[in-house]
A protein has these predicted regions:
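Bacterial N-terminal signal peptides that target proteins for export
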Residues: 2-15
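A short, Gly/Thr-enriched small/hydrophobic beta-strand-prone motif that recurs across taxa
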Residues: 33-52, 173-186
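Tryptophan-paired
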Residues: 65-119, 194-319
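Extracellular beta-sheet/turn segments enriched in Thr/Pro/Gly and aliphatic residues
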Residues: 130-175, 306-366
Length: 366
């Protein structure tokens, strides 16, 4: 090999080595992440542990996710909806394709088979509200007579989407906005109860939610029992022929939207015991607050009428975790209420069960 050819070969190898070294320096973090190139990847995960078990139930409960990325002016710069089996797989994350910057992450999630909620298509954050579909009554109120989809809301503000190569992962916490209320009426006399005899309802004003999950002004909405059944349980006792050995009951199920502290009775809210208690700005007037009502259709009389939020919060003291009242309501999603009826279908006692906790009240007015 001539001198010129030797110098050319050495120069070519040196140039290749320099290019290779520059490439390694530019992609060292990517190699660390195992990507093999200089790309930037954004991934968003979702977590639903705002429950009384303090365990992430996202994979088990959530079937559909719609994610919005919002810029500093509240404009939607990117959105995507994903649903199906992929959400239930371990490690699920939504891939996000957006320019580097700072964004707020907003999510509406849940099940979608019933079409219970409507979220408008919009490029503005303030219009990404959620409305519970309802029947319109002739009196200007709404009625929900069927079970509805589960609904979850998530918000993660002011997140930086970096421009340095690598994988960026963000986790959006979710709050569940739907609650199941199961009511059991029991008869002490052993008389069989007909499910058609009783009406169950919960009037409320919680059918519209803003982008930040706060309630918007709404028409009165009445939740009706979407399932009722008569049931009997008991055992025959030959040695006690006159004893009541069976329990007859009517079981009803209702589903409501988000429970809020604003529906707590003012008399309970007042800490000073002043009379009358001062109404807070966020509160509703007493006559418009959420109540569970059971009516005897045969007589037209009200069997039971209780402030649902008040009774739910009575159980809060049983839990040994520090949380405010709204967090407690958000963590609850199922209420089991048992009402024992005596003579004349008047309630004798009532209990509310939440997980393993039980509170019992006696009707001292009978």
């Amino acid at each position: 090999m001539g001198t010129s050819s030797y110098i050319y070969a050495i120069g070519k190898r040196t140039l290749a080595a320099i290019v290779c070294a520059l490439t390694l320096l530019g992609c060292d973090s990517v190699i660390y992440d195992g990507e093999g190139d200089c790309s930037v990847n954004y991934r968003v995960k979702f977590r639903y542990d705002m429950n009384l078990k303090f365990a992430d139930a996202f994979a088990r409960e959530v079937e559909s996710v719609t994610l919005y990325l919002l810029d500093g002016g509240g404009r939607v710069v990117w959105q995507r909806t994903e649903s199906g089996e992929a959400l239930g797989k371990e490690g699920y994350a939504m891939e996000v394709d957006v320019a580097p910057g700072t964004y707020d992450l907003l999510a509406w999630c849940g099940s979608t088979d019933k079409g219970s909620f409507r979220i408008p298509e919009s490029a503005s954050r303030k219009e990404l509200t959620c409305t519970l579909m309802r029947e319109s009554g002739t009196d200007g109120t709404g009625h929900i007579r069927e079970d509805h989809d589960r609904l979850y809301h998530g918000y993660l503000p002011n997140q930086t989407f970096g421009d340095t190569e690598g994988i960026y992962t963000y986790v959006v916490p979710l709050v569940k906005n739907t609650n199941n209320v199961r009511v059991v009426l029991q008869q002490t006399s052993g008389e069989r109860l007909d499910k058609k005899r009783f009406s169950f309802r919960i009037p409320a004003e919680n059918g519209r939610m803003d982008w930040d999950n706060q309630l918007l002004p709404d028409e009165p909405v009445t939740y009706h029992a979407w399932h009722k059944q008569s049931a009997t349980a008991g055992t025959a006792l030959p040695d006690l022929p006159d004893a009541v050995t069976s329990v007859n009951a009517v079981i009803a199920e209702l589903t409501t939207a988000r429970l809020m502290v604003r529906d707590k009775s003012a008399t309970v809210r007042s800490e000073t015991g002043t009379n009358p208690p001062q109404l807070q700005p966020e509160e509703l007037p007493e006559e418009r607050k959420m109540r569970l009502t059971v009516r005897d259709n045969d007589t037209g009389k009200t069997v039971l009428s209780i402030p649902l939020v008040d009774y739910a919060l009575l159980v809060k003291g049983e839990y040994r975790r520090d949380m405010d009242e709204q967090e407690f309501l958000d963590r609850m999603d199922e209420y089991n209420i048992v009402c024992v009826l005596g003579e004349g279908m008047r309630w004798v006692s009532m209990s509310i069960n939440i997980h393993s906790w039980k509170m019992v009240w006696q009707n001292t007015g009978i």
